């Protein structure tokens, strides 16, 4: 029998799983700066492997989309799994295994120049089957680099 988690413990576990246990997300160097039921903030540093335009040292569009996807996924999944005061760890893992991105619509607004980037996401709506989030990516100078609307299967 698995441990029973409070909503706060479940949210913490989801954050750790998304950011620190998924190999691709670890490779991106994502850092979870803030995570609440309907808000998440991730940050990461630009690395040579993330450059899509080597002549200008611009962040690859796939890296941008990935960071936006993770940030949006955190709020969609977190809000769904913490609807009740408690959840068993087994149920959390089982439900999480059935959740995933349905659609990710990215607007690349500026070239991804910078050394450090921050993705912030907020929940727009969470239903029984589908959740939607809005995400923004800024660099260390607070330049608005990209935005996304993301839809997730959550039920």
Swiss-Prot record:
GO terms for molecular function: acyl-CoA hydrolase activity. Pfam families: 4HBT. It catalyses: a fatty acyl-CoA + H2O = a fatty acid + CoA + H(+); a medium-chain fatty acyl-CoA + H2O = a medium-chain fatty acid + CoA + H(+); a long-chain fatty acyl-CoA + H2O = a long-chain fatty acid + CoA + H(+). The keyword Transferase does not apply. Its EC number is 3.1.2.20. One of its GO terms (cellular component) is cytoplasm. CDD domains: PaaI_thioesterase. One of its GO terms (biological process) is lipid metabolic process. InterPro entries: HotDog_dom_sf (IPR029069), PAAI_dom (IPR003736), Thioestr_dom (IPR006683). It is found in: Cytoplasm. Keywords: Cytoplasm, Hydrolase, Lipid metabolism. It is an enzyme of class 3 (hydrolase). Its main location: cytoplasm. Displays thioesterase activity against medium- to long-chain acyl-CoA substrates. Is involved in the thioesterase-dependent beta-oxidation pathway of (9Z,11E)-octadecadienoate (conjugated linoleic acid or CLA), along with TesB and FadM. Belongs to the YigI thioesterase family. This is Medium/long-chain acyl-CoA thioesterase YigI.
